[in-house]
Every structure is written in C-alpha cells, then in structure tokens.
Amino acid sequence: FVSYKDDKPVFVCEKGIIQEQRFMKEYSANDYNHCFYIDHGSDCLIVTEAIVDMMSIMELTEDFKRYNYLSINSVTKYQAIFEHLKNDTKIKSVLMRVDHDKAGIRLNEKVCLKLKKQFPHVRINIEYPPKEKDWNDYLVYEVNKKEKVDAYTIVF
C-alpha cells in the first residue's frame, strides 16, 4: 500500500494476506504524520487502525467517496489525525472506527480528550464493529452470513 502527498510517496506498507503467516512491513522513511490517507474532499474523516479495516469499511459503506479515510496503522501513531485536521480545515467530524479491544478503547479515550481540547469545533463519533473485533472480521462475518442465506435461497 502506498500513500501519496503532493504526488510523492510518503507512506508505504506491505501486508501479507495469509492468516497463518502474518506479515507486515513498514519503511523507516514513512511519514507518520501523514500515514495512509485517502482524500475525497470530504468534511468527514474516518480513522481506522489498519488499512485492511479501512478497505472493509469502504466496502460496507454505501457511498464510500463521501468520506476521507486515515489508517494510522497502529494505536501508537495517532498523531496523524491531528496533523490532517490542522492541514485540512474543512474537516468537521471524525469517525473513530478502531478495533474493539483494550488498545482501541484506550486510543479512543486519548484521541477524544485531545480532539476536544485542540479542535473543539470537530464532532467525534465512536463506533465499534457490531460483531467481531475489527472491521475486516465484521465484513467477513457479513459476507459469510449472506452466503449462508443465499445457499438456502430457492429461485423459482
């Protein structure tokens, strides 16, 4: 995955897709004030922990281009949220869509406190996946649920 700023790559992340052999590589030259960012010119920013969760939310969202997206790639690299708010004054709301675990809950607490102090005009919304720990697992759950229903559907 490559994220660009002013037509230059500023954040590169490699990620494996085989669950039994977890692989992820980030590069030392990555700009963690930018992270992996997709700008659709929206006033609403969706923040995720992982790029795959970002893509899952895009798939689950009816019109994914209504939002900007930021994957911080770790609960420790949340500074990028504030950098994007500082550099893009049209953003009016932040939708926190991180993992539903202790680290994700703590991240939301930290970010909300800091956002309220530094950007009091920005609305904050926190939502966790209704089922499963993260948004990619939730997408898989929804697809499997639909396929199970489709498998029992009889077409006349």
Segments and roles (model prediction):
Residues 42-43, 59-156:
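TOPRIM fold recognition
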Residues 1-87:
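Phosphate-handling DNA/RNA-contact segment within nucleic-acid enzymes
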